[in-house]
Amino acid sequence: MKAAGRLLGVLATACAALAVLASCAREDKNDRIVLGFSQIGAESEWRTANTESIKSAAATMGIDLRFADAQQKQENQIKAIRSFIAQRVDVIAFSPVVETGWDTVLQEAKAANIPVILTDRSVTADPSLFAGFIGSDFVEEGRKAGRWVVEKFKDGTDDVNIVELQGTVGAGPAIDRKKGFEEIIAANPRFKIIRSQSGDFTRTKGKEVMEAFLKAETRKIDVLYAHNDDMAIGAIQAIEEAGKRPGRDILIVSIDAVKGAFEAMIAGKLNVTIECNPLLGPQLMTSVTEIVAGRPIPKRIVVEEQVFPMETAKQHMQSRKY
């Protein structure tokens, strides 16, 4: 009987110790939120600023960030999300490289009871599969670019020939920025997009595609519309190498408003940039903490943004954070 009593005592002590350890583990997990984030890559100045904002905000708010760079490949993002599910992170967030093809992996996250937040770009999947989307209104960005072009040529009567450097094929910003721009210029038949091709949001590809436009096009090119600043900066080099003056012989409108664009505007080589704010880190981390606390977040969080013509570039340059 005494031996049995001692055994029961040992078991009780062991159980109590296990309970304490489990409690500590839960407290540690609750004290430090774990966020799995899949980034598209590092294809532009904008993306670099976006990544820095996310990492900085996570550190400031004490969130354990598990970061994965997809190198602009959807299959890498899907692998990363599945890895986050296996790790049982508290929240998953990602900037989708393209709009389609996410349903299966998002359903897997939902089945694991791990909420998902989309940043920068959205998807075409069932909205019930993600908690919310934080990012810009890409259609409106395209409209702003279109309005600037229409206003610039409002007093003329000649046709306005436009070449377009699109973003990554299938990416939300590329689809929406094209849609918004075309929506505005469609009202006036003078404005014609005579060539349009993907520059994949990169400086190198932007230069390459612009070189091809300049060699193949016999008509005068009046405007270059680039879906981001990096492609525009690459195209500027191609225009100069072709013996033309960017910003004068060919007017250039682009999107993002990174420092490189302001430098190009100050140099007179880029006419206007439409802001797309990459500093989404604080909003993302706030949303993550809200979700973990059991509070809902808005399904759509839109970032406010401005238009910066070259005439205002100098006065805004010093205050730019990216």
What are the language-model segments listed below?
Residues M1-V34, A59, D64, T104-I114, ...:
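Short, low-complexity disordered leader/linker segments with a strong preference
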Residues K29, L35, Q77, I134-D159, ...:
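Hydrophobic alpha-helical segments within soluble ligand-binding/sensing domains
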Residues V34-M61, L65-S83, Q87-V89, S95-E99, ...:
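Extracytoplasmic "Venus flytrap"
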Residues W46-M61, E141-W148, G172-F191, K205, ...:
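Short, solvent-exposed amphipathic alpha-helices that sit
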Residues F67-D69, A125-V150, E164-L165, S196, ...:
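Short beta-strand elements at the ligand-binding edges of bilobed clamshell
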Residues F94-A111, F181, R195, G199-E263:
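Hydrophobic alpha-helical
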Residues T100-E140, E151, N161, V258-I266, ...:
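Flexible loop/hinge segments that line or gate small-molecule binding clefts
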Residues L165-P173, I184-I185, C276-Y322:
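Hinge/cleft segment of the Venus flytrap/periplasmic-binding protein
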